[in-house]
């Protein structure tokens, strides 16, 4: 479990924190709080790590494990250096403000009033009681990480992740089959999700560990982020609506079961949902930070699943048609979104369509 905690802290906390630190520097208009940016960024660390690994394996195949592990660390270290030493950034001030926002809870409106605190605690207690009496709760909670990967989709993704790790190339991915193991792809989604297992295997080989605990933790982690995101969005209108909406997610047995199952659904739904929300916010506020977050989440939505890739094309078109600004600015934003979409997820589908399996065509 120590290795799992190390992987989780490094990828989901440290890497996500570096990304959050960079995004906060550009949050000049404060249309979105620094705390909300940090919470959103918790889901970006694993995805960024996966896409970095994708480009490393694509451009530098067949390298030893230490090469990819060190390359990822260097990438984040360079990002941190750029953030710290860029003359236009004031990292110290923004970092202090972020710490204050956690300490004083200035950004959380519902904690400013005693009545709201009581309501929040009551809702938490109710959710806890529901969990405690739910018939299958113990089955899903006890030994969750010790259960083998089971289920059609996740077994496929797990197999792919191990193949990427063993071969250090995407050759079989774009051929559609892997003769050595007899594995044949059943879908043409981007390898973003299975690469998280590849990343765990690479780190584990260096530290003498061979587990898949971190990969298994991805589903509940992004399930929790969905709950946080729903609360964050609905709290703009009403704190009570946010509490009700967050609690309502667990009123469905399907969401609860998905929360404690090995699957890609919550991972891809998180990026799909955030991309749609930031599309609307970008058009409404014309805020630079909202547009940046739209670019990032849209790219990862495409990279996580083919449905996200298809919807991303329509999302870019909607942005261009409904974003009210001078034509030159609309064109600039349009190509910025296209570029980020291509780098973060679209390239895979372009390459697969032209030189690979043909994707969905």
Regions found by a protein language model. Give the residues of each.
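Membrane-interface alpha helices of multi-pass inner-membrane proteins
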Residues: 279, 290-306, 316-317
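Transmembrane-helix motifs of polytopic, lipid-linked glycan transferases
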Residues: 77-83, 214-237, 274
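Specific aromatic-rich, kink-prone transmembrane helix
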Residues: 15-20, 267-284, 297-298
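Membrane-embedded, hydrophobic transmembrane alpha-helices
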Residues: 1-113
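Membrane-lumen/periplasm interface segments of specific transmembrane helices
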Residues: 136, 321, 325, 332-361
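Transmembrane-helix signature of polytopic, membrane-embedded enzymes
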Residues: 32-39, 209-213, 230-251
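Short hydrophobic/aromatic helix or loop-helix immediately within or flanking a transmembrane segment
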Residues: 53-55, 159-162, 179-208
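Short acidic/glycine- and proline-prone juxtamembrane loop motifs at membrane-interface regions
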Residues: 260-267
């Amino acid at each position: 479990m120590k290795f799992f905690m190390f992987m989780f802290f490094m990828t989901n906390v440290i890497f996500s924190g570096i990304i959050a630190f960079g995004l906060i520097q550009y949050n000049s208009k404060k249309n979105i709080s620094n705390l909300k940016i940090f919470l959103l960024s918790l889901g970006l660390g694993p995805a960024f790590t996966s896409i970095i690994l994708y480009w490393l394996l694509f451009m530098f195949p067949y390298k030893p494990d230490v090469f990819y592990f060190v390359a990822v660390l260097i990438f984040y270290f360079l990002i941190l250096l750029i953030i710290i030493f860029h003359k236009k950034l004031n990292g110290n001030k923004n970092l202090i403000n972020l710490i204050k926002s956690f300490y004083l809870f200035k950004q959380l409106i519902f904690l400013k009033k005693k009545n709201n605190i009581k309501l929040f605690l009551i809702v938490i207690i109710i959710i806890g009681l529901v969990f405690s009496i739910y018939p299958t709760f113990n089955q899903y909670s006890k030994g969750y990480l010790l259960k083998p990967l089971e289920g059609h989709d996740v077994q496929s993704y797990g197999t792919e992740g191990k193949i990427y790790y063993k071969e250090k190339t995407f050759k079989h991915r774009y051929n559609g089959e892997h003769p050595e193991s007899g594995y044949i792809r059943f879908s043409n989604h981007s390898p973003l999700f299975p690469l998280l297992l590849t990343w765990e295997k690479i780190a584990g080989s260096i530290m003498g560990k061979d587990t898949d605990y971190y990969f298994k933790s991805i589903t509940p982690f992004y399930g929790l982020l969905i709950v946080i995101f729903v609360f964050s969005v609905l709290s703009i209108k009403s704190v009570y609506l946010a509490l009700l909406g967050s609690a309502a997610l667990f009123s469905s047995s399907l969401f609860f079961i998905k929360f404690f199952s090995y699957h890609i659904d919550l991972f891809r739904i998180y990026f799909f949902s955030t991309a749609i929300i930031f599309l609307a916010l970008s058009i409404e506020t014309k805020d630079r930070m909202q547009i940046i977050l739209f670019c990032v989440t849209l790219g990862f939505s495409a990279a996580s699943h083919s449905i996200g890739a298809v919807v991303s094309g329509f999302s870019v078109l909607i942005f261009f048609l409904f974003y009210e600004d001078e034509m030159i600015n609309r064109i600039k934003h349009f190509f910025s979104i296209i570029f980020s979409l291509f780098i973060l997820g679209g390239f895979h589908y372009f390459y697969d369509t032209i030189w690979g399996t043909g994707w969905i065509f």
